[in-house]
Every structure is written in structure tokens, then in C-alpha cells.
UniProtKB/Swiss-Prot annotation:
Protein name as it appears in the record: Uroporphyrinogen decarboxylase
Site note Transition state stabilizer, residues: 85
Lineage summary: Bacteria, Bacillati, Actinomycetota, Actinomycetes, Mycobacteriales
Organism this protein belongs to: Corynebacterium glutamicum (strain R)
Role played: Catalyzes the decarboxylation of four acetate groups of uroporphyrinogen-III to yield coproporphyrinogen-III.
GO cellular component entries: cytosol
Length: 358
């Protein structure tokens, strides 16, 4: 894989709380952004997406920029997260995939054999539609508002490819891992350049940070994660690390994997709501030393009302500070422990951001 270079045109941020926290500096306020902050919780999102498929919208520069910016305008979050989907790199590479309403990504042809792996297209270059959208986004963001890019981690993409779509148990995926490990490792290795080139495209266009998102890693044992997944996520984060921008690593239900995942090399570790932040920090620091924490409000608590919401936010902030004071963490970025739920009231998200910033 060719060496990556730092884009000469990358903008200079000034007092950007997300980036300061990610770099272990003291931010001007508690930084916050929410996974899936751009989406169905916003009426303006539903309006602009009407009649346009999810994947198509990810390849329309003006539309993806508008959707990315909507929550920044409305909620005063400290970062925009690029509106996209984890299967966008697959579609850009030429893989037949659609996002089916009510189900999720569905592949035209599952990958089940060594021949299937060898025939899987690789994303060789940049994604111009996404780069154009990023340019539009950066024109509106202030120099204190970060733009976070992202990509799906190789295990999650591999699971979609092997299962042919979403799976409750990932039985075909695990069967390939253990029953045909040679094919499994070949598939993971083949996904690496597609993911790296997707992130490279975003970085070339000017993103300020990135997140590697492993939706399904929580279904794995630590042993399986370490043997079958970690080497490939590590390779991706190492390649992106040459760009010298903050890297966030997050997986759902990964409390028992935090130590193993931290070995992949990100500066920031995302934590879901099932693990107290100070305990998560201990698990991470014991393996990889202190890192910046991201998280970890239960998305359902956005429905609870101001008083209980405030109590939970204060608890999470206190846990983060406990971890920092103990030398187990170097900073904290507030986020949910997963994505914003589609039926969340937009005004409740705005209120949560205000409480976090206060």
C-alpha cells in the first residue's frame, strides 16, 4: 500500500473542543457530538430525503452536505459527522448492495468462498461525490467545529458480505472464521484497501478526525476478535495514522473487548452505555495506557426528561473526570453509547447538548 501524505490544504482549527480533547488538551467546553445526529430524528432530514434512497443520498454532494450540517445548525454540537453509511465504500468499489428499508444493507451476492473473495471489487481511488460534499460542508463549518469522517471496520463489512445482509447471530460469519479461516483472512485482507482508500478520500477532502465503526464486534469473544479481526483494524488505523489526525475506534457491545480493541492504535476509544466510563478507562489503560474516552449516554435516556437526563450527564462527566484524575484517561468527548434513536424528539437532543455544555 502506498505511503499516505498530509494534505497541504487541511484547514487550521481554532479552539475546536473535539480536536483539543482528542489530542489530550483541555477544551474550552465539554465537547459533544452524537452518532446518528444527522438522520431521522430531524424533521428537516425527512424533508430533504423524501423520495431519495439512503445510498443514493450518500453520493449526492449537495444533499449529503445539507444532511451533515443540519444537526450542527440545530443542536450546537461541536462536530459534524459525515452523512454516509458503512457500505458506501463497497458501493463505490462496485459491489452490488442496497439499503432496504426496515432491514438494512442487503448484498446482491454474498461472499462465501475463496473465489467470491477474489472476485470482490476493491476501491482503488477516491470517491469524488463524497469529496465534493465535504468541500461544501467545510465552507459552512466554523474553525471551532470539526468534521468527523468515518468508515465501517472490516469485521462489520465482512459480516454483511458473508451473511448477505444483517444477521442476529452472525452464524455464517463465525462458521467461516473457524471452519475456513484461510478464506476469512483473505476476505479481511481484501477489505483493508477499500476501507483505507475510503478514509484517504475523506482525509484528502479535509476531514478533521475519523471514526472506525465496528457495529457487530460485540458479538465476538475476545479470543476471536484478537485472532480474526484485530490485525486488520490495526492495519487500517496505522495507514490512516500517517495523516496525523485523531482516530476514534468504537464498537457496540464491546465492553469486554475494550482492551483488545485499544491495541489497534486509536487516540480515542468509544464506549457504549453498558460500561461505566471509569471502569472502561481502567480496562483500556491496563492494556494500552491512557487514551481519550468517548461516550457514553444511553440513547434511550434522551426520552427521560430534563431532571433524569441531567443526572445521567453529570454522572458520566464525573466518571470521566475520575478516570482522568486516576491517570487512566487523557480526556473525554461526550457522546451517546450508540446512535440517536430514530424517534428521538429533536428538541430533546438540543436540550441534552445544552446541559452537557453547561
Amino acid at each position: 500500500m502506498s505511503a499516505l501524505t498530509i494534505p497541504a490544504a487541511r484547514r487550521t482549527l481554532n479552539n475546536a473542543p473535539i480536536i483539543d480533547a482528542a489530542n489530550g488538551k483541555t477544551p474550552t467546553r465539554t465537547p459533544v457530538w452524537f452518532m446518528r445526529q444527522a438522520g431521522r430524528s430531524l424533521p428537516e432530514y425527512k424533508k430533504v430525503r423524501e423520495g431519495i434512497s439512503m445510498l443514493d443520498s450518500c453520493f449526492m454532494p449537495e444533499l449529503l452536505a445539507e444532511i451533515t450540517l443540519q444537526p450542527v445548525r440545530r443542536h450546537d454540537v461541536d462536530a459534524a459527522i459525515l452523512f454516509s453509511d458503512i457500505v458506501v465504500p463497497l458501493r463505490a468499489a462496485g459491489v452490488g448492495v442496497e439499503i432496504v428499508a426496515g432491514r438494512g444493507p442487503v448484498l446482491d451476492a454474498p461472499v462465501r468462498s475463496r473465489e467470491d473473495v477474489l472476485n470482490l471489487p476493491i476501491l482503488e481511488g477516491n470517491v469524488p461525490e463524497v469529496e465534493q460534499g465535504i468541500g461544501i460542508i467545510l465552507d459552512e463549518l466554523s474553525d471551532s467545529q470539526a468534521l468527523i469522517g468515518f468508515a465501517g471496520a472490516p469485521f462489520t463489512l465482512a459480516s454483511y458480505l458473508v451473511e448477505g445482509g444483517p444477521s442476529k447471530n452472525h452464524e455464517k460469519t463465525k462458521a467461516m472464521m473457524h471452519g475456513d479461516p484461510e478464506t476469512w483472512h483473505a476476505l479481511m485482507a481484501r477489505l483493508v484497501p477499500t476501507i483505507v482508500n475510503s478514509l484517504k478520500s475523506q482525509i484528502d477532502a479535509g476531514i478533521d478526525a475519523m471514526q472506525l465503526f465496528d457495529s457487530w464486534a460485540g458479538f465476538l469473544t475476545e479470543r476471536d476478535y484478537t485472532e480474526f479481526v484485530l490485525p486488520y483494524s490495526t492495519e487500517i488505523l496505522e495507514e490512516v495514522g500517517k495523516y496525523q489526525l485523531p482516530r476514534i475506534h468504537f464498537g457496540v457491545g464491546t465492553g469486554e473487548l475494550l482492551g483488545a480493541m485499544s491495541k489497534a492504535g486509536s487516540e480515542v476509544m468509544g464506549v457504549d452505555w453498558r460500561v461505566p466510563l471509569d471502569k472502561a478507562a481502567e480496562r483500556i489503560a491496563a492494556v494500552s495506557g491512557p487514551k481519550v474516552l468517548q461516550g457514553n449516554l444511553d440513547p434511550a435516556l434522551l426520552f427521560a426528561g430534563r431532571a433524569p437526563l441531567t443526572k445521567e450527564i453529570e454522572r458520566i462527566k464525573a466518571e470521566a473526570q475520575t478516570a482522568i484524575d486516576a491517570g487512566h484517561a487523557t480526556g473525554h468527548i461526550f457522546n451517546l453509547g450508540h446512535g440517536v434513536l430514530p424517534n428521538t424528539v429533536a428538541e430533546d437532543i438540543t436540550e441534552a447538548v445544552s446541559i452537557i455544555h453547561s
